[in-house]
């Protein structure tokens, strides 16, 4: 975003208790809020496989385990919606990517709907998001409304059936509705198969799922980035350091990876 000429304000691990002052520290954004709950799935990071609270968060200063809520994308988004009701909210990162359609929640032992429904956010960027964040910023700067951004690849949004671009057509994959999956486990299994297959295709189809009288629409991903595009992203002058807020504190995960190099990129599933 900075390379494209935009200013980015980063608020790390805001305090979600009390008066929400952390969410107001840097004021109202000109274009949109972007929410990412972290490099690891937030619930895996917070709980063990036995559903016990972990004693340490390797991604937090001094390993503290109490600096992020459960499902931070949902918590942060609802707070921002309360404070700035008319500012667009875009979810990204592994938490939203893996919850973009009906999904099984291991900790609640139930099926949950597309995370946009609970977070009251406007859009999800799934997978790697270098192109989408810039495209969204450019569209909003040119006067587009967030609800009209239905054409950006590798994004997810909710809309009514009549507002789906080109309508539901034979090239789309129409999944069983969320409500149907709640009553039939086989429907969820069939959905999961389609989602996995499309996530691994070079040329994927658009996926739609009915939920709460609207549709979750998953646009196909961007084509694989070229060598020049990958180099352009990774050659930017990153500091590769923790946020200045954590100066003087130890972040266990950073100590482990601070001399590491990238050898691969995340896939389009997450």
Task: Annotate the PLM regions.
Residues 1-2, 33:
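Catalytic alpha/large subunits of respiratory electron-transfer oxidoreductases
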Residues 2-8:
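Short helix-loop-beta junction
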Residues 4, 79, 83, 136-140, ...:
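Generic, well-ordered alpha-helical scaffold segments in large soluble proteins
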Residues 11, 92, 126-127, 233-236, ...:
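Generic beta-strand/beta-sheet core signal
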Residues 12-212, 218-223:
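Glycine-rich beta-alpha loop elements in corrinoid/cobalamin-binding modules
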Residues 190-263:
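N-terminal [4Fe-4S]-dependent radical SAM core
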Residues 270:
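Conserved small/polar residues in nucleotide/adenosyl-binding loops
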